[in-house]
């Protein structure tokens, strides 16, 4: 997709997507809009069954809300967050999915269990629990606990509103991993198959070599983003994470929504994959980074292939 020069600010669009024309976005491109707002009024203004994919990472439970000192505990999730997810269920198309990236923090001597409670709460709301993906971090930050190892995984739970959720694994194929013996055998095969004798003596059969590209697993091995971060956001997931789910669960031109958008990583992935997007972030300190991230284009896009 051609990108505008870094000096050219993408124009503001009106009425995209349908249903929020009366709300002025803080920033927009030909594909999407950013709103600096609480996410509830944006969700309420959207028409029902208008979203193809919702992907988000809400604040971790019990942790300060980054710079403002507010804590997002279990009560916050039971009240505000569940109101958000109730609206998301209404706004999803019948084939749409909701992907929730979440990891409970440790509390004293035990791990929090809110991530598992959320699965049950969402099922009670009417969601179908489709899949759980694990985001594995090869180089996690060092731990600060005497009796625990480095925290190297987070969960991405996929939910839908009907059993007919769309799914495009062919967009996410990964190179097959063959051992040395398999690779040597593949080099000897003519036309990618060979004929071998049946053990029963009933003739011959063809044995086809395995494919070069295969479906990926539910283990997503991605480096986290930490350390030097010009946006000062403490929990920005890598752009490869939303990119994977956008490829897997949507087609070009469909609409992606993130109600807790942060610095706009979901928007950057959607923009470069040709999907329409709507991002909401209440903290302008974080959302201000999005125009530069969109304009950076290849520098960002190269990190999610």
Question: What residue ranges belong to the model's regions?
Answer:
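Core catalytic lobe of class I
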Residues: 1-289
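Cysteine-dependent PTP/DSP-like catalytic domain, specifically the C-terminal lobe
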Residues: 285-305
